[in-house]
Amino acid sequence: ISDIVDYARSGADRPLVMCEYNHAMGNSNGSLADYWAAIEREPLLAGGFVWEWKDHGLRQEVDRKGSVNGSTWRYAYGGQFGDQPNDGNFVADGLNASDLAPHPAMRELAWVHRPVAVVADGDRGFAIHNRRSHSGTSDLRGTLTLLVVGEVMHEEEITVDVPPLASVQRDYSSALIAALNNAS
């Protein structure tokens, strides 16, 4: 990450788009939040491509012992068809399985790429950060929920139009503060 930040601060005259910067094999694609904190902080960092979207396994019929042509199936890859040479399990490296069922890393990617971030701002309120670059948040609605030991004590809808790439501070409502005081 320090290398891309160094590039962004080097006086370069063109943006950097990373290719295959975050290899998704297994659960190996950590550091996404760190990458995107740098990308959002540095104007010359224009994002990147995660390698890769989907596993390349093919459906293969097998029996309970794993022998081909049985009563069940698996996603086969890399030599499981008798092919030589092959890439082994190196083709099972996607954010999604071959049937597009998401792997756990997809949840992290969705969180890091969320269009709006809401962050507590001390004990008085919160900040809403619009991470979209071309539209405000007037098309979105949020819900502020106060939970105490898993029980909903207060809930209210939040609608606020935050301009593209901007932040808005909001104070907690008097109703929320009253609910919080009653819960203590």
Name every feature range the model reports, one short phrase each.
Residues 1-123, 127, 132-138, 145-151:
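Extended substrate-binding grooves/exosites of carbohydrate-active enzymes
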Residues 125-173, 181-184:
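Beta-strand-rich binding/interaction modules
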